[in-house]
Structures are given as structure tokens and as C-alpha cells.
């Protein structure tokens, strides 16, 4: 028997073992599913089922119900108090470090990226640092006269160069920032930069953009420039978006749990699953999948329940001496508001039902305060965004 024949024989044995393991696993899943169904049949009754569905319905109308830790700026695994304090100190230092270091040299031109406040995800063996950044192509089209195709081509190359240099600076090079920071954290460090197409998609980036606009302009932040910014930002119907979002979640949840309860009452005889090798969801997994999502389009569910897609309200507060006019008061304040910040379901209902007065949607606010000093004095920029 030659070596090739032995290798083929070994490969066939491994395939047979894998098939047997998969069949055993599917058999165990089938058994557990049947045991679970019998237990639920004994314990559930109609009154309990409807109470359970009503409770899920009330929880489902909260936009923040699916993601309660999205706004955390630091997620630390609490295994040691001293280590937790050290990680918090390092996180603050890294935040300042990234703001200073993210300056790239491309074609002998210096580009400074506008970044958001980083989000630190700590685990036992790794630290993942996530942040948003914004690229502006205004600097590359000053000498181009209304040639949109040329601007788009240059911007695409410019964006690719910056993205590749950014990844090399953070993660890939031997002397990258991640390798250096791993010596301080005593664990692997990785960066996850996320590019934003518009500066108004993050409050930190929008506030920093206003600060740069104020420092680079001879006229500072005039009302005309604020109006131009307002015209570029979207104006969405928050009532329609919120109601559509709530209806999508309610429909998905009611269909899913009604399908489960219906299958329990029918003893799983009405929804047979295809357990052939070509079916990726065969056996117990395929049966459970078909039961839960019988009346739902699985391809549209992620997009329907995706959060923070729409900006429905924003405000900008300018305080202090932003103007070049030296006679302006320090207490001068200008407030600009567009959209809404009150995402309450009962406001939009036709009937003021007492059951819905406490059933509100948590407001998703992103707030950033930035202070700086110019030649006339100190000023403050406060940006507040409401996303759904």
C-alpha cells in the first residue's frame, strides 16, 4: 500500500467520523427539544402565555431594549480591582494619544483625522479599541474647477491611502501603536477604526469640526455658516421612523413566540424539517429555525431592527466669545435646534391610555462639550444628537 492510498484511507475515515459526530449531535438536539416541549406543555397555560406575550410586547417597544451597552465608553472585565484602576488610567492616556498621533503624511501633505472618543473593550487576554473617524476631501479639490468625476477619483485614492496608512500605523507594522500599547496593558491590543461618511453622525466629530471651522475662519462661526450646516444635515420624520421601528419589533416578536407556542400545542408535527445533507438547517436545528421564523423574512429582520440608523434631532449651543467682535459679552449664547429629543410613544397616540404613560422609548442622546480659547476669550461648543 503506497503513501497516497494510506492518506486517502485516513481521509475517508475522518469524514466518516465527522458524519457520525454530526448525526449524534443532531440526535441529542432532537431529544433535548422534545424534552423541552414536554416540559413547556406541562407548565404553560393560556393565561400564562398571554401574560408572557404582553410583557414581551411592552419590553419590545423600547428602542434601547436590544442594545443596553452601546453607549459605554469603557467595558472592563472586573477580575482585579488594581488592574481595573490601571486600565482606566491607560484608557484616558490612550484617548489623548490617539488625538495627537493620528496625523498622516500622504504625498508630502499632512492630514489630521477627526476622531471620536474611543470605546475600550477589555477582556482577560485582549483590549479592543474602537473609534470613529471622519475624512474631509475639501483640502484636495481646492484647485479643481467643478470636475466631479475627477474629484471622486482623487477622493477614492485619497481615502484608500489614508485607510491603508491608518491600519499600518495602528495594527500592522512592527512598531505599530498596538504593539507598543500591549507592553503597558500586558495583553494584546487591537484597533477597530470605523469611517463615517458625514461628520454629523457622531457628536464628538461634529463638535470638533465646528471647533476647527471656528479656528480656521476669519469670520469665525457666523450665522451663515451655521445655516449652511443646517441645510446639509438631514430632516427626518421621527414619528414615522419610531412607529415603524416599534411595529417591526412587535411583529417579529409576536410572530416568533406565537409560532413557538403553536408548535408546542401541535407537538411539532405540523412543521417537518428537511434533514438532507444539502439543507444547512436540517435536523433539530432546521426544525427549530423553521418553527420560529415561519412567517418572517429572515433577510429583512437585521435591517428592520438595526439601531442608530437615523438622525431625528440635533442641537448646537455656542457660548462665549466665538466672534471676532471684542465688544461681545462673555455670556452670549446661541442655541440652534432641529428635530426632536422626546421619543415618547404615548405623545403620538390618539388616546392617552394610562397603560402607555410609563411605556416610553429611551432617548438615545449623544452629547459632547468642547471648550477652547481664542484671542478674544473662552468659548464653548455643545453638540447634542438624537438617533433612532
UniProtKB/Swiss-Prot annotation:
GO CC list: mitochondrion; ribonucleoprotein complex; ribosome
Cellular localization per UniProt: Mitochondrion
Pfam families: VAR1
Ribosomal protein as UniProt keyword: yes
Domain of life: Eukaryota
Keywords annotated in UniProt: Mitochondrion, Ribonucleoprotein, Ribosomal protein
Molecular function terms from GO: structural constituent of ribosome
Keyword Heme: no
Main location: mitochondrion
GO biological process: translation
Intrachain disulfide bonds: none
Record family assignment: Belongs to the universal ribosomal protein uS3 family.
Function comment: Essential for mitochondrial protein synthesis and required for the maturation of small ribosomal subunits.
Name used for this protein in its record: Small ribosomal subunit protein uS3m
Organism (species): Kluyveromyces lactis (strain ATCC 8585 / CBS 2359 / DSM 70799 / NBRC 1267 / NRRL Y-1140 / WM37)
Source organism phylogeny: Eukaryota, Fungi, Dikarya, Ascomycota, Saccharomycotina
